[in-house]
Amino acid sequence: MIETYNQTSPRSAATGLPISMKIFMYLLTVFLITQMIGSALFAVYLHRRLDKIEDERNLHEDFVFMKTIQRCNTGERSLSLLNCEEIKSQFEGFVKDIMLNKEETKKENSFEMQKGDQNPQIAAHVISEASSKTTSVLQWAEKGYYTMSNNLVTLENGKQLTVKRQGLYYIYAQVTFCSNREASSQAPFIASLCLKSPGRFERILLRAANTHSSAKPCGQQSIHLGGVFELQPGASVFVNVTDPSQVSHGTGFTSFGLLKL
């Protein structure tokens, strides 16, 4: 009987770093990270400190310069005449530059103010107002959402806008009327934008017409007029209609205005 003997192979030793080595690597990593953070913080502190030192040095130089000027004025013998003359010359140059810059700034501000005064914004927007008069010229009032920018444009006699400055103006008008009221004739309803210049006859700038309607209840129709015209100082513009009794004076229906371009 043959007995076989199998010898078991020895177990392989566990691979990997020892615990002491792992601890050392961990501490080294923490140290490096801490050192980088500390270096960054120190760099920021050093930069701010250098800026502060630079400011203090500049202030100190300014103080020394002003102190030297004071000593030159008091006539202290510790300074030579040549140094005093040179320092005074530098100081006078600085003061001269400051005064010139100040004068230039004042001139620029004054020019801007004069420019604004020379080209003020001129605008007007007025609302229609019912009138018992039978005149064909529509009446207007400064009410509701009206605009009257300044005294360079005025509403005179409640019927015409008068400008006091020459220039190009955009003039507009909207007239809303009831088209099915009994009219004296079958002629269309006509709205005209008219100009009255000093020493000249009245003339029509724009005109629009709309036909009557038999629709009931009252059929509202609107006429729009608008254009750009050259106006002289003292010129007046107004709106003329064929039948003012048909004009609707409700909110936003009929309005009139101008704007200087």
Curated annotation (Swiss-Prot):
The soluble form derives from the membrane form by proteolytic processing. The keyword Cell membrane applies. One of its GO terms (biological process) is positive regulation of NF-kappaB transcription factor activity. InterPro entries: CD40L, TNF_CS, TNF_dom, Tumour_necrosis_fac-like_dom. Glycans are attached at residue 240. Keywords: Cell membrane, Cytokine, Disease variant, Disulfide bond, Glycoprotein, Membrane, Secreted, Signal-anchor, Transmembrane, Transmembrane helix. Its main location: membrane. Changing residue 224 to Y: In HIGM1; no effect on ITGA5:ITGB1 and ITGAV:ITGB3 binding of the soluble form; increases NF-kappa-B signaling. One of its GO terms (cellular component) is external side of plasma membrane. Residues 1-22 are cytoplasmic. It is a single-pass type II membrane protein. Changing residue 224 to E: Decreases ITGA5:ITGB1 binding, B-cell activation, activation of NF-kappa-B signaling, and anti-apoptotic signaling. No effect on CD40 binding. GO terms for molecular function: CD40 receptor binding; cytokine activity; integrin binding; protein serine/threonine kinase activator activity; tumor necrosis factor receptor binding. It is found in: Cell membrane; Cell surface. Homotrimer. Interacts with isoform 3 of CD28. CD40 ligand, soluble form: Exists as either a monomer or a homotrimer. Forms a ternary complex between CD40 and integrins for CD40-CD40LG signaling. PANTHER family: CD40 LIGAND, TUMOR NECROSIS FACTOR FAMILY MEMBER. Cytokine that acts as a ligand to CD40/TNFRSF5. Costimulates T-cell proliferation and cytokine production. Its cross-linking on T-cells generates a costimulatory signal which enhances the production of IL4 and IL10 in conjunction with the TCR/CD3 ligation and CD28 costimulation. Induces the activation of NF-kappa-B. Induces the activation of kinases MAPK8 and PAK2 in T-cells. Induces tyrosine phosphorylation of isoform 3 of CD28. Mediates B-cell proliferation in the absence of co-stimulus as well as IgE production in the presence of IL4. Involved in immunoglobulin class switching. Belongs to the tumor necrosis factor family. This is CD40 ligand. It comes from Homo sapiens. The gene is CD40LG.
